[in-house]
């Protein structure tokens, strides 16, 4: 029996009857709740559940009644009441609903959280029940999809207080918020007065006591150019431009590249930052500390030692032909570097040098792989290649383009070398098994500290003639462009017009790197790699007859070096200079990588020739031993791995974009190269300067965080101080500023000789009275006329030959003239002649010009 609540009145309020529950009322309410709960338990009948786990057989639909109700209870491990519509859905539809509601994180082929059909359907049923249940909390419950995800992941069912505060649109005035005051905003002019130095009462930008570049904490992000003083602005900009760019409070000043004077006031230690001038001595000290064995390296006579010393080598099937060697072509000399960075001289392709290079690059092929079924396994590797890298729809819809235009571009490129359409041979009449061979005159810079014990061996090039390459190169170029268009998004080949190492929206930080170093890559390739390449080329759409023809004359070939007179047969190994060298090496590396590692675990994969680099969130899992046991490669997993490929480091800026930076250690070595030809107008030196500037165009993007990344990667890779890398960047910034700064790194001995001999601007001429031919005729007449054949000379009344020296006196003093004439006359020597009786005597004093026609001055 329910008692009416007491009415509100002053009497009930005073005696405590209104608004207060008496013990009798409390007991009455509890008894009513117990009766209602007992009635609900008596009337409740649970519905049978259906097991929709993986163990359901294919004929599970036959067990259902026509009305769709389950026939029997299979399992009661999960709740299905209210989710019958999801029980009838297929697995694919459930997966789509799972991705929509729960929004799992995909890591390779794994989902986090993992998909469980039973738990997902139970979460849907519980979410529907919770939304229909009466509200017992003042907090806002999540919407249906978010509630399903919260139940599945066992998280909070309600929105956080921050979200509730954002959803509740309440008008709150500034007076209602404690601790805050809101004032009307007014636009300012933006002018900030410059800081004034307390010591000299000058603007701190011009004050010698204040180093503005020493401020580490500034409003904007520091760039690399902030740490170095401008070398000079004379003739670059006028005063008006300088004044408008630097602000109204700065007067036009003449910028000099010099160190500021020592400050007269104390600077706090946290503001101290070195801004010393970069000079040639600093760069040399960096080389000495980073490359200790390179500073005293001089190979000026190393090749002379090799040619003149005893030589012993072990090669099979080598043919030497020393009868028609090509003599060395003399050049005009090379520029001499000021820096000593361990760079070597140009190598000359002599017989011994070529044999040494062939021994290292072409002969002694390693045999590390096991015996396998080549045809079956090569097809499996090629199939894995297409599954891992190629988008099948793009490959089916694409076609060859620009084959003919590539051919015309190739002919125009080499037109200056004498290649014309009339010189193209019939390929069926040519023996394509013969390759020309040569060594690279430029030796790759050595970054290891082994120059004191090891002499670098030059690389070799095996190539066809341009007339043959011009007919294969356009086809393979078009095929490579089609291959790039069909690659998946995470695969990058940094070659061509549509790809590069610049990756927008990808950050290399907080990633695991995988770098595989493949040694002896070219000569380690055998028949297995050739079959893999053939299957991949056919799959990409290359005409099968051309692929078969190309692979046939790569099974057995003969290389010959005409300059050195050396020839030898080779088989299967990669030709380092034909039309498919880069493309073939790239697809072979990609195929080997896909067979040893699951490519789905990587976010980005970069391939270029024999170089490979992968980025993943988790440590990469794979079997690198297959590179050796199956593919006959000497592979080494680089530890610790850093983002390094193609001799470049990959760095990320503050916006999450990745760009490439050349290896500073190799760039410093290139500053001391000895291969720049000499020219009077410095055209070759300027070409090297422009190449240097193009490689270092990244300097404008180097912020302080990028410099810190480079220092860490440099230290991890080379086990050398990372601070040296930052100092190298300072040198690069100076020598890329202008050509005059770059010219400080090189000089020529010819110019020194010209400067030494420049004191004499007069014409120096030697006139001969009696030539050698006249003297011989004179001797023959004397022997014929003189029967006694008496010796003739200064004692016998012979005539002396005189040397006349004519010299204009436009410049120079008379004393210099007399000194030069006396020095010239002092070098005359007696000329020996043959006596009639077999005795030797002295004919007369002759100048050296009559002995051999050469006068030393």
From Swiss-Prot:
One of its GO terms (biological process) is positive stranded viral RNA replication. The keyword Amino-acid biosynthesis does not apply. CDD domains: Bromoviridae_RdRp. Residues 780-827 are annotated as: Disordered. Residues 780-789 have a biased composition (Basic and acidic residues). Keywords: Nucleotide-binding, Nucleotidyltransferase, RNA-directed RNA polymerase, Transferase, Viral RNA replication. Its EC number is 2.7.7.48. It catalyses: RNA(n) + a ribonucleoside 5'-triphosphate = RNA(n+1) + diphosphate. It comes from the Viruses. Residues 804-816 have a biased composition (Polar residues). InterPro entries: Bromoviridae_RdRp, DNA/RNA_pol_sf, RNA-dep_RNA_pol_alsuvir, RNA-dir_pol_PSvirus. Residues 511-624 form the RdRp catalytic domain. SUPFAM superfamilies: DNA/RNA polymerases. Pfam families: RdRP_2. GO terms for molecular function: nucleotide binding; RNA binding; RNA-directed RNA polymerase activity. Belongs to the ssRNA positive-strand viruses RNA-directed RNA polymerase family. Interacts with replication protein 1a. RNA-dependent RNA polymerase which replicates the viral genome composed of 3 RNA segments, RNA1, RNA2 and RNA3. This is RNA-directed RNA polymerase 2a. It comes from Cucumber mosaic virus (strain FNY) (CMV).
């Amino acid at each position: 029996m329910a008692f009416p609540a007491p009415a509100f009145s002053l009497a009930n309020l005073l005696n405590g009857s209104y608004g207060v529950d008496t013990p009798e009322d409390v007991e009455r309410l509890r008894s009513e709740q117990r009766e209602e709960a007992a009635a609900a338990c008596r009337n409740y009948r649970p519905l049978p559940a259906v097991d929709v786990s993986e163990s359901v057989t294919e004929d599970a639909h036959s067990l259902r009644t026509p009305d769709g109700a389950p026939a029997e209870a299979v399992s009661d491990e999960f709740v299905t009441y209210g989710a019958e519509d999801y029980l009838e859905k297929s697995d694919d539809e459930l997966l789509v609903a799972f991705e929509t509601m729960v929004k799992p994180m995909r890591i390779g082929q794994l989902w986090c959280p993992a998909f469980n059909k039973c738990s997902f359907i139970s979460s849907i049923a519980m979410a529907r029940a919770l939304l229909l249940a009466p509200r017992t909390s003042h907090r806002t419950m999540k919407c249906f999809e978010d509630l399903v995800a919260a139940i599945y992941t066992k998280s909070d069912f309600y929105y956080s207080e921050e979200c509730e505060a954002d959803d509740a649109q309440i008008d709150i005035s500034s007076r209602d918020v404690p601790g805050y005051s809101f004032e009307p905003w007014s636009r300012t002019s933006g002018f900030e007065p410059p800081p004034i130095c307390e010591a000299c009462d000058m603007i701190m930008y011009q004050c010698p006591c204040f180093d503005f570049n020493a401020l580490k904490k500034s409003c904007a992000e520091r760039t690399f150019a902030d740490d170095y003083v401008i070398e000079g602005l004379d003739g670059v900009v006028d005063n008006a431009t300088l004044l408008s760019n630097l602000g109204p409070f700065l007067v036009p000043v003449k910028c000099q590249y010099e160190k500021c004077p020592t400050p007269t006031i104390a600077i706090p230690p946290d503001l101290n930052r070195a801004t010393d001038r970069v000079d040639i001595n600093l760069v040399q000290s960096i080389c000495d500390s980073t490359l200790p064995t390179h500073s005293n390296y001089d190979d000026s006579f190393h090749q002379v030692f090799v040619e003149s010393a005893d030589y012993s080598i072990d090669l099979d099937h080598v043919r030497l032909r020393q009868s028609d060697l090509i003599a060395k072509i003399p050049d005009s000399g090379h520029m001499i570097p000021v820096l000593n960075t361990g760079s070597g001289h140009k190598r000359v392709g002599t017989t011994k040098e070529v044999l040494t290079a062939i021994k290292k690059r072409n002969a002694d092929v390693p045999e590390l792989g096991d015996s396998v079924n080549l045809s079956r396994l090569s097809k499996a590797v090629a199939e894995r290649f297409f599954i891992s890298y190629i988008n099948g729809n793009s490959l089916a819809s694409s076609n060859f383009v620009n084959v003919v235009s590539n051919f015309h571009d190739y002919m125009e490129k080499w037109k200056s070398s004498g290649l014309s359409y009339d010189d193209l041979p019939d390929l069926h009449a040519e023996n394509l098994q013969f390759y020309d061979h040569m060594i690279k005159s430029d030796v790759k810079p050595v970054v290891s500290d082994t120059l004191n014990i090891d002499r670098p061996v030059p690389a070799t090039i095996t190539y066809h003639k341009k007339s043959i390459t011009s007919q294969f190169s356009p086809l393979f170029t078009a095929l490579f462009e089609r291959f790039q268009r069909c690659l998946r998004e995470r695969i990058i080949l940094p070659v061509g017009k549509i790809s590069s190492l610049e990756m927008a929206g990808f950050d290399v930080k907080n990633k695991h790197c995988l770098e595989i170093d493949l040694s002896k890559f070219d000569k380690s390739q055998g028949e297995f790699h050739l079959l893999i390449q053939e299957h991949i080329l056919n799959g990409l759409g290359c005409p099968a007859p051309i692929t078969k023809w190309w692979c046939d004359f790569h099974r057995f070939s003969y290389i010959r070096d005409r300059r050195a007179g050396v020839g030898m047969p080779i088989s299967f190994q990669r030709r380092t200079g034909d039309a498919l060298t880069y493309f073939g090496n790239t697809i072979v590396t990609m195929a080997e990588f896909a067979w040893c590692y699951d490519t789905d675990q990587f976010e980005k994969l970069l391939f270029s020739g024999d170089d490979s680099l992968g980025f993943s969130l988790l440590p990469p899992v794979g079997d690198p031993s297959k590179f050796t046991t199956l593919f006959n490669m000497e592979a080494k997993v680089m530890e610790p791995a850093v983002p390094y490929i193609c001799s470049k480091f990959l760095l990320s800026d503050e916006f999450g974009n990745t760009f490439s930076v050349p290896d500073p250690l190799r760039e410093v070595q290139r500053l001391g190269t000895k291969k720049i030809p000499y020219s009077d107008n410095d055209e070759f030196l300027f070409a090297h300067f422009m190449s240097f500037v193009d490689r270092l165009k990244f300097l404008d993007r180097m912020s302080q965080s990028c410099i810190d990344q480079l220092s860490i990667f440099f230290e991890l890779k080379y086990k050398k101080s990372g601070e040296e890398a930052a100092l190298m960047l300072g040198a690069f910034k100076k020598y890329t500023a202008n050509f005059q700064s770059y010219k400080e790194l090189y000089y020529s001995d010819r110019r020194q000789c010209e400067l030494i001999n420049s004191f004499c601007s007069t014409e120096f001429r030697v006139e001969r009275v009696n030539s050698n031919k006249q003297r011989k005729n004179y001797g023959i007449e004397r022997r014929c006329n003189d029967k006694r054949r008496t010796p003739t000379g200064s004692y016998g009344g012979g005539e002396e030959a005189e040397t006349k020296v004519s010299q204009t006196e436009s410049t120079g003093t008379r004393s210099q003239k007399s000194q030069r004439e006396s020095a010239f006359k002092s070098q005359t020597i007696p000329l020996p002649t043959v006596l009639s009786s077999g005795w030797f005597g002295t004919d007369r004093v002759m100048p050296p010009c009559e002995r051999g026609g050469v006068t030393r001055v």
